[in-house]
Amino acid sequence: MATTIKFTKMQGTGNDYIYVNTLSSPLQDPIKAARKWSTYHTGIGADGLVLIGASEKADFSMRIFNADGSEAMMCGNASRCIGKYVYEKGLTDKEVITLETLSGIKILKLHTGNGVVKDVTVDMGTPLLSNPGQIATKTGGMLAETIPADGKEYKGTFVCMGNPHVVIFVDDIKEVDLPAVGPKLENHPLFPERTNVEFVEILPDQSLRMRVWERGSGITMACGTGACATAVAAVLNHKAGRKSWVRMDGGDLHIHWNEKDGHVYMTGPAGKVFEGEIEM
């Protein structure tokens, strides 16, 4: 007998996920659900699945499954959406929320008005600057290395924001064939657990134009951890200051790499697309 699951589709700067409150709707096989529901033609259509649950360490917990069923350590856009979800659903009246993720406890500050969450600031923690072989184990020092792929050579800066990223600065982002080079860099032998890939152009106003190929999901409209990694890489490569706007296909995020505490703070919107029920 099929089980009916309630869900909410939400998006943060165009990065859309299917959200299930497991406090009220337990989900037995999230890997299968992520693969089935993320498909646009035969499912709900999304970049993946997010489970909102209880936590012994924080106010709530978050688990993220990419469209291919693989589990992600962290998602900045999803964390903002969870802040909006739990507040507007009446699961909390707090405007500062702690969220347990596989990459640690994140602190969310909700910017509200008339009972609605307008924007969310997430303390993304301290970036871990690693070489490719260590980026998944979160040790080592920052490394910029030339990566051969798709008949070209790319100079990448490696940053871990709870998940691995390689940030590549280019003169003209429109010339990047992301569908071709994205999967080759994601699965490059340098990255034992695969990686997220960001191509970045510095715009005349010093903002950062970014396009992303996400590990396990492919091209997406935006990536919160990717925006943070991009801002950090821009500082390390002397291309931007510690406060910057990252402009993606789905919208803009403000990123602040705080010099005092070393933490990265991401601020941006979160929105509900629709709600529904689906059989599992």
Swiss-Prot record:
Active site per database record: 75, 223
Record-listed substrate binding positions: 15, 66, 76-77, 163, 196, 214-215, 224-225
Enzyme Commission number(s) of this protein: 5.1.1.7
Entry superkingdom: Bacteria
Keyword Lyase part of the UniProt annotation: no
Subcellular location: Cytoplasm
Site (Could be important to modulate the pK values of the two catalytic cysteine residues): 165, 214
Organism of derivation: Phocaeicola vulgatus (strain ATCC 8482 / DSM 1447 / JCM 5826 / CCUG 4940 / NBRC 14291 / NCTC 11154)
Pathway noted in the entry: Amino-acid biosynthesis; L-lysine biosynthesis via DAP pathway; DL-2,6-diaminopimelate from LL-2,6-diaminopimelate: step 1/1
Protein name, as recorded: Diaminopimelate epimerase
Gene3D superfamilies xref list: Diaminopimelate Epimerase, Chain A, domain 1
GO BP, one annotated term: lysine biosynthetic process via diaminopimelate
Keyword Transmembrane: no
